[in-house]
């Protein structure tokens, strides 16, 4: 019996995503200082937070070094080799972030060497036929920005806009797709409501203020990017969750921020990882982080985003899977539902798997493994996992075989 083939639209972008702090190594920012102060504390929290099977499978969670990003994957120096692998694996695009603290380590002081570094990154991508999707804020900020109150400072949107102008002016003509903010709601919630990210505040009013300032930061950046390059495309990466039978959560988490900026976006980036259902669905497979795997949720989220009448790129989708036992099926199952949404006139134009490489998973450290490519953090050796070759076949054929 012949297999059914699901073709994706011509020109569909197939790629992977990373962020600067998670892969580059050597960053000095608010987060790098915070992780050093909290590493020992996280080892103690691990025993309370994670389940027994996770503790047994990943004993490194009890080592302070797990929580300090350090050299990470050293992508800062090895980016050309990593892009060679991406090209070899059939990718057509790559999403990465520019580290604000490298460009503006002190307020108003611009590091031209770092601008040149990112210029070389973009050139290396172009030479390999990889379309860059560039994020400008992926959770990390310079220390000076943090000392001024971070996203609670009324001037914060203007500080960010100044950085955006500097980057855009210096990299003019090299970037077609800009992502101003990555998961603004999630980061603001963790930083100012739940207190799990720096600066560890727990205040609903501070959370709402940060969200409003992030929305304003995007609006200013959107206008600046288009003043500098009229033809560029500008959007955000929004972490939407499928909420079944929880409409208030769906509105507040998925739609409220997008509604604020709906006039200032050329596309929507969707980061999809998880769902929440009431009553809770039983016996679903889980990732190493114990996140339930529910591929159909991405279909529902995409159908909901259709109302904004904007092109959509799936800017992140992946799972922690150190043994690579579920990643291939996870990817195929999500792509099946993405394809179904496309057939029902949802304008999805690209898919970026999270992630190209194993990387530093923020407050969880190094033990969760999200990469299509395994990284030995001691030797920095890269080894493509079996799922990387399956994804490569999909990328090259622009099709999914069931």
Which stretches of residues belong to each language-model region?
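Non-catalytic scaffold segments within catalytic domains of secreted glycoside hydrolases
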Residues: 1-83, 87-92, 97, 101-402
